[in-house]
Amino acid sequence: MMKLKENKVMTIDLDGPNGNAFYLLGTAQQLAKQSGMDDVMITEEMQSGDYMNLIKTMDKYFPFVVFETNNPEYMEAFHA
């Protein structure tokens, strides 16, 4: 089971092993279930496009997740 830090923030390094799509989908599914959200709908939306869509969708539903990256293209996804 995943737990959030005391300040209710989870950090994911998109440049590391936890930045892969399978990890992000699994994390989103667990967070959605813990929050009483529709995990199937969220993960289907995450999978409906490319990797950029996946991280944008995760950011949309889980604003308490902080994504770290050195990739400027990924950073643009969060500022668009």
Describe the role of every protein-language-model region.
Residues M1-A80:
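Long, contiguous binding/interaction regions
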